[in-house]
Every structure is written in structure tokens, then in C-alpha cells.
């Protein structure tokens, strides 16, 4: 009976196991913990039921405690091990992420900063190239030498956009995230792995930036003419013989002999007007890219009248190395361009002090002839090496540092660059009056450089009740310079003085003159004494460059001069621009020259002024 009950229980237990086994074939996703617990519980129950010995129970309890302790140890050990691994992996992952993002940021910034800087330079300074930029960077700039508005505009239009786009690509959000998200969607279709997609999204940003970099640097290279700069400054240069063929070195002794025959030497007063074009006197509104509130014929009415009543040569063209202020001044005074600054010429102080020291320029000629010379400008003369250039060629400088004390007697005497032009002309008037009062006077050669019409333009509210705009700055300056010329022509000095008005270069104000317009630099010779009558056929339909003006300046005060440097007197012969053509002359001027490099050498026979 007892055996029958045991067998019955055994069958019942066996049936239960079979049932569980059968149902297990239809169940899925049991955890290892659940399976282990079931097995341990089943084995323990079975063992207790079948056990007939009391000594087995302690052994069973001991085994149970050992199993439980091992389970607890395993649970405690696994998190500690994973925590330890995560601690080791965290710095590595952080370092990798940091350098990955830093790479994206630096790559982006090196792409966008040169691009936006080039756009800013061309907006405010026109079609400049890398030669001009490096040239200015190699000279010290005084704290008051640059208008603070230019610094703010550079930060706003070049630096901040570069930083913003670089950060957007480094930490995608908003518009930048759309690009990354669209890439991730496409990549997910083919890669299926989130980790691969995430790594490829970083690669996508690098690829995207690389494509932009190719476009950006190609734009920068073309606009700034970087390849031409590298070619002209490489170690093993191919020198051209252009200067050897066309440069006519001024013969000071010969000029002295011609000067000695003049009974009464004439004076010379030159006014270099910032960005002044003959184009501004056009009656055709189609020449301009803007609309202004007054007829274009009235924009520079006084200057138009002075050019008509005096002697004015048609079509002074701007060629290579003459398109910014110091380059224009060098070209007018030395009859060669400022094409590049040789790296073997030295840096900063040496170049600034001995600027084109071995070249013979207009100042050297007048110094040899015994003229009194002076240069007047309202801005700081240290900018772009201007002070060093004129000191190297015997012309003393009167700039912001010497004029500002006088200017403080005027209300609102400053413009964007220093002392405004109306105050500068007032200073020059007093200087000329003091000179006229002298008993023993030398002949003089004085030079004045204006700044009100430098882009984006300064409107002198004391003279013109007009809103600030570039067109209004031209109109207001026209009134200021017209009053000064009228005063001078009524002064006792006018009779023996040739007054010359020259634009220093074409305007740098973008989108003011139509690109299709034939542009030329303003010039007017008032009361000249040319050695050959300037008939109409010698004045019209001509093609002159800055270089030809040097010979004309000497000839206008009765010193016969057929050529000077690369300049040719258009009253006597055809200019190089007319002989070679504009494109050929520009190409030749861009080539390295041994003669030009020698101009930068130190001349021990000269004295600095």
C-alpha cells in the first residue's frame, strides 16, 4: 500500500515534470536566473522528499548557502568590473571626442576665415591682392593709425561669421543639423549600425568642409593673386629684363644744368586727393551703379570746372602696383610701381626707415635743386611706411602728430583717419602764409594728401548739411577743395606756383561706378609752365599712367623733362601704356626685377629728413 502511494506520487511528480517539459517547448525568453532558480528549487524539493537521512539536511542547507553566497558575489563583482571598465574607457572616449570636434572646428575656421576676410577686404578696399596686404602688415601701425570702425567692421563681417559657422559645424544645431540629419538618414539605409552612422556623420562634416575649403581657397587665391605672389617671391626667381629695357634713371646733374638756365624758379603745390576719379564728372548716369539725390554733373562741380579751365590729360589709367595710396604716391614721385616688397629687404623698422632708399625720386631731385619741401596729411604717417618713404627722399612730414595740436581749436576736427580735410587745408593755409612772409625764400615743393573721400566716405557736417554717404562725401569734399583753390589763386604765391590736383588712385568704394564704365584718375594742372605747348591733340585720347606724371610735374615748372623712370612726358612722346598696351604693361610690372630689388638697398650717401 505504501509502495503503491510512493509509486503514485512518483508518477504524479513525473507527470508534472513532463507537463512542465512539454510546456517549456512552447515558451521562449526565459532568463538564466529563472531557469537556474527553477532547477535549484526542483532539485532541492526532490532531494528532501526522497531523502531518508537526517544528516543530509544540514548538508543541503550548507550547499544552499554556498550557492546563494556565490550568486551574491557574482552580482557584486560584475557591476564593479563594468564600473572599472567604464572609468578606464571614459577618458579615452572624451579625448577622442574632444580632438574630433577640435579638428572640425579648426578645419572649418581655416576655411571660412580667409574667405570672409577676403570679402571684407574687397568690400572696403576694392580689388587688392596679397602683395598689398602683406606689404601693410610688414609696417608698424600706430594705435591711432586705423579708424576703430574698420576694426569693428572686420570683427563683425569676417571674424564672427567664421566663428559662428565653425561652431555650428562642430556642434550641429538648427540649419547645420539638417545637413547632418539628412546624411544620417541616407547612411542608415546602407550601414544599419548606429555607431557606424555616428562615426560617418563626423566624416560627413569633414567632407562637407573640405568641399567648401576647395571653393573658398580657390576664390581667395584668384581674388588675392596668391599664385603670382608666390612666383615673384620664390627662392629661385626668373628675373625679367623689363626695367633694364625701359627704366630711365633720372640724371640729377643733367637736371641741374637745365634748372640753372631758369631765371626765376617756380614753385610746385600738389594736392593728392583720396580716390578721386575723372569719372565722377560724367554727365551720364549710366556710368554709376548707384542713385544719388543730385545730378551727377553736380557731384564734383568745382573740380570739373578746374579741370576744364586748366590743363587736364585724358585717361590716366591705374595699372599694377598703383592702386592704393602709398603705391600711388610712390608711382607719382618715383615713376615706378609698388609691386612687391622683397623679403630680403628686411622687416618693420629697417624697411620703414630706409624705404626705397636707393631709388631716385622727385624729392631727391628737388633737394638737389635747393627747394624747400614739406608733406601734409591729416592721418598718421607711420601707416604703410609713408613717413619712412618721404624721409628717405628728403621730404619732411607734417601729419596727425604735428597737426592735431593745431586742430584742437576746431570743433569735431576728426574724420575716419585723423584730422578732417577742412582743418588740414586751414593748417596748410597758415603754413603758406608764414612762408610768403619770409624775406629770403627758397622755391618750394609742397604736397598735401586728403582723406575725407576714402571709402566709405566722410561728410563734414560743418560744411555740408547732408546725410552720410559716399556720394555726399565726394560732393562735400568738392566744396572744401574748391574753396581752398580759390583762396590760393588769390594769394601772392599763385603767380609763381604751379598747382596740380591729382587723384591718388581709383575709388575703392564697391558698387559705386559701373564695371563697364571706362574709368580714369582725376588730374588738373593749374597755371603750369610746360616747356612745350599742350595742344588739344596732345591732351585728348591719351593713355597715361602714374609714372608719366613725374616727368610732367617737373616740366610744369619749366624744367625740361622727356622721361623719368618708367614715365614718359606725353607732350614729347608716347607713354609706355600707349606703346605696350594695358595688359602687357601690367604683366611686365608683375615680374621680378633685379633693378627694382636694388631700390630697397641702403644708400649711405643720403640723409634722412
Annotate each predicted stretch with a short phrase.
Residues 251-609:
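Solvent-exposed soluble domains appended to multi-pass membrane proteins
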Residues 228-258:
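Short coil-to-helix leader/linker segments, especially the first N-terminal amphipathic alpha-helix
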Residues 18, 30-33, 39, 45-48, ...:
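Intrinsically disordered, low-complexity segments enriched in serine/proline and basic residues
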